C-alpha cells in the first residue's frame, strides 16, 4: 500500500485494532514512547468522514479462542514462548525486559499478541497475523515465522 498524506479507503488496511493507552513515556532523547494495549480487532467497513481526520464505520472481529483445556494449543503456545525468549536472548537489539514479560504472561491470547507485536517481524507478516481470526491458526503461523 502506498503511503499518502490523504489516504482513501483503498490505502488503508481493512483489519486493525482498538487500543487503550497504558502509558506515555518521555524518553531521554526528547522523543515520546506510547505503550498501547490492543483490546479488540476491528474491520473497517467504510470511511464516514475525512475532515479534520478520518472516521469510519467498523465491525468488531470476533476471535476464535481454543478452550483452556486444549493441551495441544497449550504446547503450541509454550513452544512459541520458548523460541521467542531464545530469540530475545540472542538479540543485540531487543530489550531483555521483553523476555521477562513473556515469561510472566499467563493469558495465551495476550502472550501470542504480545509476541506478534513486539518482535521485529516484517510489516507484511504482522498484517498477515493480525488478519487471522483463529488464535490457534495465528499461533501456528507465528511458530512458522519464528522457525
State each model region's role.
Residues 1-147:
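N-terminal low-complexity, acidic/polar interaction/targeting segments
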Amino acid at each position: 500500500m502506498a503511503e499518502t498524506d490523504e489516504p482513501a479507503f483503498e490505502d488503508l488496511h481493512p483489519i486493525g485494532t482498538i487500543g487503550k493507552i497504558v502509558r506515555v513515556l518521555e524518553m531521554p532523547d526528547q522523543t515520546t514512547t506510547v505503550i498501547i494495549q490492543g483490546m479488540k480487532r476491528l474491520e473497517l467497513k467504510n470511511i464516514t468522514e475525512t475532515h479534520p481526520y478520518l472516521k469510519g464505520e467498523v465491525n468488531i472481529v470476533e476471535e476464535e479462542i481454543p478452550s483452556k483445556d486444549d493441551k495441544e494449543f497449550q504446547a503450541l503456545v509454550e513452544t512459541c514462548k520458548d523460541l521467542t525468549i531464545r530469540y530475545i536472548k540472542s538479540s543485540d537489539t531487543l530489550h531483555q525486559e521483553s523476555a521477562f514479560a513473556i515469561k510472566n504472561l499467563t493469558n495465551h491470547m495476550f502472550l501470542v499478541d504480545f509476541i506478534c507485536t513486539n518482535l521485529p517481524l516484517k510489516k507484511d507478516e504482522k498484517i498477515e497475523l493480525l488478519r487471522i481470526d483463529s488464535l490457534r491458526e495465528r499461533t501456528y503461523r507465528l511458530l512458522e515465522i519464528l522457525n
